[in-house]
UniProtKB/Swiss-Prot annotation:
The gene is spcS. The keyword Cell inner membrane does not apply. This is O-phosphoseryl-tRNA(Sec) selenium transferase. PANTHER family: O-PHOSPHOSERYL-TRNA(SEC) SELENIUM TRANSFERASE, SOLUBLE LIVER ANTIGEN/LIVER PANCREAS ANTIGEN. It catalyses: O-phospho-L-seryl-tRNA(Sec) + selenophosphate + H2O = L-selenocysteinyl-tRNA(Sec) + 2 phosphate. It holds the Pfam family SepSecS. Its cofactor is pyridoxal 5'-phosphate.
Length: 436
């Protein structure tokens, strides 16, 4: 692509040596274009910046001879705008399709297509052979896209929602103008879950009413709410031939969830939605949508109205290139060890306080019962500069996902991907000072 002549400027042996160094430096960038998969080892930031700069310079707003008379010409007032968008000021997509190439943005279009290819290779490394797109919107809005696609392709008009006290998916259903049928949770010891037979009964009732239901299940959520049994739900949805969308916000970071997804994909799963920030350590703002159904992924991309910001997609790409598969798997391993440490520390603390280390199902978060106002305890932790814990009263039907009275007041703490060991130790230490 580049053609410049340095012959005769320096001795031939030096010329060859210089070309060797340059080619070696650019090899990782060349591999991204040629192999279109996540690198095993991460690429350093300077090379990623060069890679992004190279692509962004292909967009028409960088053409010094371009005559720009449209209403949308990537005109920016400040250089900061260009920096924040990594130079992709035209964004991605066209008004009719998120993944369509944008004629004014050759570089951004290549960047987005590469991101999706690399994302698919990343999932393959994790054992999921899926089609995938990085979305420029977070989990809740990405769920809206999936529901909109289900309505268009299958005529779905009501969402069966096994109750989880998460405002984002609830608002996602409202946003696309679909009705919702909640399926209530039940209590089993310390755990809260939704029986699959109740989900099936809800599907039957909606079909009897002449509606076309789809199911929005929850794979990842705060305990004591269990993961939905997505494998059995997938079997039910296959049997009734109805769409099944899974909210797997932080499912990618732990093998416990990945194994469930592998099994569920054998049956009816139309799409899974995950968060880029919760799994790939990006700034908030992007989503990951994946499925074994390439046509449904296409339908989802068609549901996005208008052109989109490239920035959330660039953030996803940067994380994939910077981490590489080897470092990501190491982060996954560290997360598992961090959760083990959190469990041990909270279990020890519960014995000191006379509370209970709750028997819940989560590879990410843990719960400990408390004998005083949990909301006040969480507030004290915040004032001690600890962010993340949730304090839930047993009478808080929304917080504990249970419409009855839960067994305990409790605190939830997380050991998600990227957490530092010292943060786990310090947070439990500060909680101990509050409780004792």
């Amino acid at each position: 692509m580049l053609d410049f002549n340095i012959e005769g400027l320096i001795p031939k042996n030096m010329e060859k040596r210089g070309e060797l160094v340059l080619n070696e430096y650019l090899k990782e960038i060349e591999d991204v274009f040629n192999h279109r998969k996540i690198p095993e080892n991460g690429i350093d930031d300077e090379k990623i910046k060069l890679f992004l700069k190279f692509l962004s310079m292909m967009d028409t707003d960088k053409d010094p001879k371009s005559v720009r008379i449209g209403e949308r010409e990537a005109r920016t007032y400040s250089k900061i705008h260009e920096e924040l968008s990594s130079g992709f000021c035209h964004g991605i997509g066209r008004s009719g399709n998120l993944v369509d190439p944008q004629p004014k943005a050759s570089g951004a279009s290549i960047m987005y297509a590469l991101t999706n290819k690399i994302l698919e290779s990343f999932f393959k490394q994790l054992g999921l052979n899926v089609h995938a797109i990085a979305t420029p919107i977070s989990t809740g809005m990405s769920i809206s896209l999936c529901l909109s696609a289900a309505r268009k392709k299958y005529g779905s008009n009501v969402v069966i929602y096994p109750y989880a006290s998460h405002k984002s998916p609830i608002k996602a259903v409202s946003f696309v103008g679909m009705n919702m049928r909640l399926v209530e949770t039940v209590l089993d010891g310390d755990r809260v879950y939704v029986p699959v037979e109740d989900i099936e009964n809800a599907i039957k009732k909606e079909i009897e009413l002449g509606n076309r239901p789809c199911v929005l299940s929850t794979l990842t959520f705060f305990p004591p709410r269990n993961s939905d049994d997505i494998v059995e739900i997938a079997k039910i949805c296959e049997n009734y031939d109805i769409p099944h969308i899974i909210n797997g916000a932080y499912a990618i970071q732990n093998n416990y969830y990945l194994e469930k997804l592998k099994k569920a994909f054998k049956y009816r799963v139309d799409a899974v939605v995950s968060s880029s920030d919760k799994n790939l350590l990006t700034p908030i703002g992007g989503g990951l949508v994946y499925s074994t159904d390439a046509e449904f992924i296409k339908e989802i991309s068609l549901s996005y109205p208008g052109r989109a910001s490239a920035t959330p997609v660039v953030n996803t790409l940067v994380s994939l290139l910077s981490m590489g598969s080897k470092n990501y798997l190491e982060l996954v391993k560290n997360q598992k060890n961090s959760k083990k440490l959190l469990d041990e520390l909270l279990n020890d603390l519960s014995k000191k306080t006379g509370g209970k280390f709750l028997d819940v199902e989560s590879p990410i978060a843990s719960c400990i019962s408390v004998n005083s106002d949990p909301v006040e305890i969480a507030a004290k932790l915040y004032n001690l500069r600890v962010t993340g814990p949730r304090g839930i009263k047993k009478t808080d039907h929304f917080g504990n996902c249970y419409l009855g009275t839960y067994t305990h007041d409790y605190i939830v703490m997380n050991a998600a991907i990227g957490v530092r060991t010292e943060d786990i130790v310090n947070s439990v230490s500060k909680l101990e000072k509050i409780l004792l």
